[in-house]
Amino acid sequence: IENLQNFYRKYYQPDNAVLLVAGKFEAASTLALIQQVFGAIPKPNRVLEPTYTQDPAQDGMREVNVKRTGDVQLTAVLYHTAAGSHVDSAAMAALSEVLGGTPNGRLHKNMVEKKLAVNVSPWNFDLAERGYVMFMAELNKTQNLAEARKVLLEELEGLQKKPVTEEELKRAKASLLSDIDKTINDPQKLAVQLSESIANGDWRLFFLQRDRIENLKLADLQSVAANYFKESNRTLGQFIPTATPDRSKLPDAVDVAKLVADYKGKAAASEGEVFDI
């Protein structure tokens, strides 16, 4: 509980928080109320240190398989990407739509419609620092996990052989820009999205991303795909349902002080150096 309290005191402070008010309200009285409620909280003495390091580029494909009881199979592919404020994030958002959109995305057409998977979904994480993009396929127990994995990788890492088309780009941009327009017209959604942009550095990033999406070209998507969707930058995970998981039994750490308390050892060697003659 002490660790939890220390974490709370360090980060849950007004100087590390964002407050957004959305909808129809009276600005002066609202600001006065905010000042009344939060202004009384003293400024903390602690200093929030900036991140002092970052993950280096991945130097080889990684894979993890989890075998537990369950009803569905999963295979997922994750790639490291740039920070959400980077220009590449707009092209990555469009690529995620081209590949993972429903019902026109390549993965939906080549996996779901062909009964290789029940569902395929993209997860694009734009963070203040380097982020990642993930594509996950869900299978029932009768579908072939190895075949689904094969097709998933071919679609993701085969964009140089099967480039994005002008029609796909146009459709992706229309979908993304439509979502942005809907967000702008919904005060609650807009507040949430602006808070995400603030966490990434500035509220204006939300509108900058819109402008970047509007100006996307095919070459932008192909360049981003070539840089990020490669084996050396890939982490692949699979969930394999197993009725009886085979787990090693790992003993707890022992009390070493108690273990050696009565230890006598063997007869001591003679003092001094021992030389072979």
Provide a role label for each language-model segment.
Residues Q5-R9, R62-V66, N119-F125:
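Short beta-strand/turn micro-motifs at beta-sheet edges
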Residues N16-A22, D71-A83, K109-N215, T235-I240:
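M16 family metallopeptidases and their MPP-like homologs
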Residues E26-K67, L78, K109, L208-I277:
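Proteolytic maturation boundary segments
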Residues V77, V87-L99, R106-K109:
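Active/ligand-binding-proximal structured segments within catalytic/core domains
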Residues I1-F7, Q54-P56, G60-R62, R171-Q188:
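Acidic/histidine-enriched segments that form metal/cofactor-coordinating
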Residues N3-V37, N233:
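Non-catalytic, conformational "gating/processing" segments within enzyme and secreted inhibitor domains
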Residues A32, S85-S89, N144-A148, D186, ...:
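Solvent-exposed, non-transmembrane alpha-helical starts
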